[in-house]
Each structure stands twice: as C-alpha cells, then as structure tokens.
Amino acid sequence: MSRHLSGFSRFLVVWFGQLVSAIGSGLTGFALAVYVFQLTGSAAHYSLVLLAAFLPSLLLKPIGGAIVDRYDRRLMMIIGDAGSIAGVAFIIVMMLLGVKSLWPIYLGSIISSVFVALQNPAYKASVTDLLDESHYSKGSGLMQLSESSRYVLSPMIAGMLMSWFNLESVLLVD
C-alpha cells in the first residue's frame, strides 16, 4: 500500500509543478495579448499574440509526442520548461532593452509555445510511469484540472496582476 501512496505522492509533486507551469503559460499568453491590445488598440494584433502563444503547441504536440516516446520523459519535461522559459525571457530582455516593436512578443510567444509541445506530452506520458493503474482515473482528473486552469484561472490572475504591476513583472511570475 505504501508503494501506491509514494507513487501517487510523486505524481502530485509533478502535477503541482505542471499546474503552476500551465497557469504561468496561460498568464503570459493572456497578459501579452492584453498588453499588445493596450499598445496598439488592434484586436487583430491581440488575436495574433494569442495565436502565437497557443497554436504552435497545438500543431506540434503530435511531433512532441513522438520525440517523448524516444527519450527520457523527465529530460523532455525539463527541456520543454527551459525552452518555454527562454521564450518568455527573450521577451523580457527585449522589453528591458527598450525594443518597442511587436516582433519580439510574437517570436518569444512562438518559442515558448513550441517547447510546450514537448513538455506537455512528456508530462502526460509520465503518468503511467508514476502511477499504478488503480490511480489512473485520479491522475487523469487532476491532469484535466491543471490543463483547464490555463484557460480559466490564467486570464483572471493576469487581469488582477496587470492592474497592479507592469507587464515585465507579470511575465516574471511565469
């Protein structure tokens, strides 16, 4: 019985990390889109930032899944998170350097989204490594909760944070 608990406990640690990562990624995508809208007043630019933040990940997940099946899943999660952080860091650096163009926001969002396409399948595939079959349904439910939080909680949190802090500070939360 303790083996089941330790496996589920290990899963909870990974799940919580992914929950924070999903909320952070959603927060970044939404905050950047709102910032671009405030800057340009253009709904088209707002939409393009959201597209850059989410579409590459959606399109590349099948390829990410194939890569994850060939390599260590923990390593793929680490690489995915590191790449996602690099995309956001690129945006922050460009803003701190005073670049007033939209291209760094688009490029950084795309970079971050591409690496999420590696990290997400690795996380989902690791469930079978971390859990016994009797805990699959619990694990699956928690995974769905963390994925949904990206789209439900992130915009609310981003809106609150952006009313108190500047964009760079909000991006650092991710």
Residue ranges of each PLM-predicted region?
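Substrate-agnostic recognition of the 12-TM MFS/MFS-like secondary transporter fold
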Residues: 12-29, 53-68, 72-87, 104-163
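Membrane-helix boundary and inter-helical linker elements of multi-pass secondary transporters
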Residues: 7, 38-39, 69-70, 98, ...
